[in-house]
Amino acid sequence: LAGVHISSAFSGEVENIRLTDGFGAVRIWLLPFIKPATVRRFFPDREIVTYNDAVRAVCDSMSLDDNERNVLICHQFITGAVASDSEQTTVGGLDNVDAALFNRFDYVALGHIHKPQTVLRPEVRYCGTPLKYSFSEAGCDKSVTVVDLNQKGDVKITEKPLIPLHDMRQIKGRFDEIMAYDKSEDYLRVVLTDEEDIPDAVAKIRGVFPNIMRLDYDNSRTRSAAVFCGTADADNKSPAELFGELYEMQMGAEMTDEQRKIVDDMISEIWEGE
């Protein structure tokens, strides 16, 4: 298609397109997603361990003319960006890249993160996705980022709101409160606060919200389960103690001495079998 430029996998050099307007030249650099292993072989004299090392090496190899306006299109996770449940990130932030590596660029158009946001400075920006892809994005307003490059150093950034046909939302309350809502075809996560499970809750809620996508409960039982799963000293407790806590959480009462003996005997048998 005319005007569409596609950059393939990194092959040692960053492709660029040179355009001109009334203010002079604009150089658009196309940097595909890279990993340390992707670029290491192209820079044998450099120590490339992290994603930051990889991007630094690539940026240092680019022959930028600082008299021109330079735009970088990049698909990396930049330190400080706020991710949602939809994106995959490396444990411990190993895939993070410092936004300061892009200081020579007049504008950096970032992809990968779904939430529209700037990082470090207004000219380093994720435009975000046009639609919401997980309920962690329910409170996120989507938009199109419009960037006007005027003379060198003069960048104007505006956001044009995107209003979806069906929004993605979360609502919370008792079952009777949820059923009293106005009918809507939005994509919903419904959180019920009733202490007892509602039979066929999803089918009933579909009468008001036909596009319900997820149903959860938030009550004393589920909160107790969350506390149990997150117990900080679980590693310091015996299997019998952990089982006892789980039993009490589920049954609302402690085990009897007879039940404890049965559990102890079963655990002993399991350990002896190993």
Predicted regions and their residues:
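Short, structured coil segments at secondary-structure junctions
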Residues: 2, 104, 120, 208-211
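Conserved catalytic scaffold of divalent metal-dependent phosphoesterases
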Residues: 2-93
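Conserved beta-sheet core of the metallophosphoesterase superfamily
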Residues: 6, 79, 84-155
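Short, acidic/turn-prone active-site loops that include or flank metal/cofactor-
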Residues: 10-12, 130-132, 217-221
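Binuclear metal-dependent phosphoesterase catalytic core
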Residues: 14-26, 31, 124-187
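A general structural motif
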Residues: 23-25, 66-69, 105, 185-187, ...
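Short, conserved loop/helix-junction motifs that constitute active-site signature segments
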Residues: 64-66, 100-104, 181-183, 208-209
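Accessory, non-catalytic peripheral segments of nucleic-acid enzymes
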Residues: 148-274
